[in-house]
């Protein structure tokens, strides 16, 4: 395999970066183990260990020798695209790491730890007042973070860019304008015409964990997931994907004992994330350009498998025999029943319970509030009422308690302001990629029906996966499909699927 890193300065950078990579590798293992294996009381020592490793990594990244090498590389003109990618990713990491003074980092860490505890108590007792003062502190920290990072148009831009490189408030505004104008009337029509149900008896059917474990393993085997050689499937409270490297990617799912589509769609979703990591160019091993380029692009891969494939008629018909074989109650249901059950549409208070059509309105609500938090004089006390008003306007339902409204997500307690829009970016891009993949694979649906997933995986590898983090998200998309993100594709997909 041809060596892609030729430049001597880049080779020096990568030799030093290997230690930073190794610390990240260890942190991934500790993070995965915390969710999957660690006994509850191990949390104190684990958090100290993770904190110390973060400090070590930060020191190595900002070591004068390392920073000087990256600065030197920025001035080089004869670099290839891979080497330019290395410089871009590291320069960005150094810029962000340098932006925050040590005392600010410490303040954020302490505040979010205490805020998370306050949020847990507030949610359990359905008492917003217990979280309110902490949310005011989080808002204040977010404003300060934006000032440290710097921005051209508005403070929220700086926070968006942390999670999705190059994303601006105007981009998010544009995508939500399309969804409000075109998706909202579609949602009303879907609910009115009732082609898909608002509820289904399969939601209440109970299952034994081992039944669904067999189904999930069968699905992953059909997808060609390299279990045992390069991948693992485990169980955690909240499904997630973590990569220790290109040859070690791990996913988790959950088994709740009812509503079996949740475990299937969680597994399929995480497979999409894992595939992105597994299909990277192996020459990127131990370098900063290994790994998905952004949260939004990553989410587009998981949503592609979950929504475009996992909720399709062809996929449901493919898995129906194995469902029937493993779930005794399935003899009462047809493939059409399962398809309708997989595609229920109903407004729900809880974002994580939302269906494909209503989900993005949950994100729109959070985007509007976050933008106000960071840009204007808005206090935490104003948020519950604003939340409820917006929920009623968008989905026609009004939360009756804080836990199904303002207190439902942990993100703000963690200080993650600017994160939510990446979920919608992923959903919109998944539909856009679908219409582009259909141009190259016109019999896409037939391939899914026959479990011929290799051509689909190869297309995703060629267009998205193999590039790792070489290009920023917008540039990667332009190279992959020749256009910018366009919310119209998702509107079209919803229309064709649900009406």
Curated annotation (Swiss-Prot):
Listed PROSITE patterns: PEPTIDASE_M32, ZINC_PROTEASE
Residues spanned by motif DXRXT: 248-252
Record bears the keyword Hydrolase: yes
Chain span(s) of sequence motif HEXXH: 269-273
Motif annotated as I/NRXXA/SD, chain positions: 350-355
SUPFAM superfamilies named among the record's database cross-references: Metalloproteases ('zincins'), catalytic domain
The keyword Metal-binding is annotated on this UniProt entry: yes
Motif residue range(s): GXXQDXHW: 405-412
InterPro entries according to UniProt: Peptidase_M32_Taq
Active site feature: 270
Control of this protein's activity: EDTA and DTT reversibly abolish carboxypeptidase activity.
Keywords for this protein: Carboxypeptidase, Cobalt, Hydrolase, Metal-binding, Metalloprotease, Protease
Domain of life where this protein originates: Archaea
Motif HPF mapped to chain: 238-240
Residues of the Peptidase M32 domain: 6-499
GO biological process: proteolysis
This enzyme's EC code(s): 3.4.17.19
GO MF entries: cobalt ion binding; metallocarboxypeptidase activity
Residue ranges annotated as motif HES/GQ: 298-301
UniProt cofactor note: Binds 1 cobalt ion per subunit. Can also utilize Mn(2+) (in vitro). Is not active with zinc ions.
Family in the record: Belongs to the peptidase M32 family.
Function of the molecule: Broad specificity carboxypetidase that releases amino acids sequentially from the C-terminus, including neutral, aromatic, polar and basic residues, but not Pro, Gly, Asp and Glu.
Name the UniProt record assigns to this protein: Thermostable carboxypeptidase 1
Lineage: Archaea, Methanobacteriati, Methanobacteriota, Thermococci, Thermococcales
């Amino acid at each position: 395999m041809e060596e892609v890193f030729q430049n001597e300065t880049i080779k020096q950078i990568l030799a030093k970066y290997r230690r930073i990579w190794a610390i990240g590798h260890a942190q991934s293992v500790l993070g995965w183990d915390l969710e999957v294996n660690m006994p509850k009381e191990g949390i104190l020592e684990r958090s100290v260990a993770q904190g110390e490793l973060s400090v070590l990594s930060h020191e190595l990244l900002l070591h004068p020798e390392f920073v000087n090498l990256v600065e030197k590389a920025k001035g080089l003109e004869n670099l290839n695209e891979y080497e330019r990618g290395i410089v871009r990713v590291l320069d960005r990491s150094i810029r962000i790491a340098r932006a925050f003074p040590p005392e600010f980092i410490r303040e954020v860490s302490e505040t979010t730890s205490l805020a998370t505890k306050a949020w847990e108590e507030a949610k359990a007792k359905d008492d917003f007042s217990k979280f309110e003062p902490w949310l005011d502190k989080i808002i204040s920290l977010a404003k300060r973070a934006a000032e440290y990072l710097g921005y051209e148009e508005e403070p929220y831009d700086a926070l968006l860019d942390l999670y999705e490189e190059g994303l601006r408030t105007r981009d998010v505004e544009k995508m939500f304008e399309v969804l409000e104008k075109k998706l909202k009337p579609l949602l009303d029509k879907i609910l009115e015409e009732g082609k898909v149900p608002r509820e289904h008896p399969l939601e209440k059917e109970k299952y034994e964990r081992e039944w669904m474990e067999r189904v999930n393993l069968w699905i992953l085997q059909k997808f060609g997931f390299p279990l045992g050689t390069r991948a693992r499937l485990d169980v955690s409270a909240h499904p997630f994907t973590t990569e220790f490297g290109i040859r070690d990617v791990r996913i988790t799912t959950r088994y709740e004992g009812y509503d079996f589509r949740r475990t299937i769609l969680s597994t399929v979703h995480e497979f999409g994330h894992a595939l992105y990591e597994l299909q990277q160019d192996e020459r990127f091993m131990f370098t900063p350009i290994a790994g998905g380029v952004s949260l939004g692009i990553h989410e587009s891969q998981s949503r592609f498998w979950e929504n475009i494939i996992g909720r399709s008629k062809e996929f449901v018909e493919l898995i129906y025999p194995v469902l029937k074989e493993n779930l005794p109650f399935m003899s009462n249901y047809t493939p059409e029943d399962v398809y309708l059950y997989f595609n229920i549409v109903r407004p729900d208070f809880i974002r994580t319970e939302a269906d494909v059509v209503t989900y993005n309105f949950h994100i729109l609500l959070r985007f509007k509030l976050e933008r106000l938090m960071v840009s204007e004089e808005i206090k935490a006390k104003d948020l519950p009422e604003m939340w409820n008003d917006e929920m009623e306007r968008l989905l026609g339902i009004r939360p009756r308690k804080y836990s199904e409204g303002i207190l439902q997500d942990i993100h703000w307690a963690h200080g993650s302001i600017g994160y939510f829009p990446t979920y919608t970016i992923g959903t919109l891009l998944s539909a856009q990629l679908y219409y582009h993949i259909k141009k190259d694979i016109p019999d896409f649906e037939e391939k899914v029906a026959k479990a011929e997933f290799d051509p689909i995986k190869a297309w995703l590898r060629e267009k998205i996966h193999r590039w790792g983090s070489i290009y920023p998200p917008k540039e990667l998309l332009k190279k992959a499909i020749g256009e910018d993100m366009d919310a119209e594709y998702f509107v079209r997909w919803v229309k064709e699927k649900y009406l």
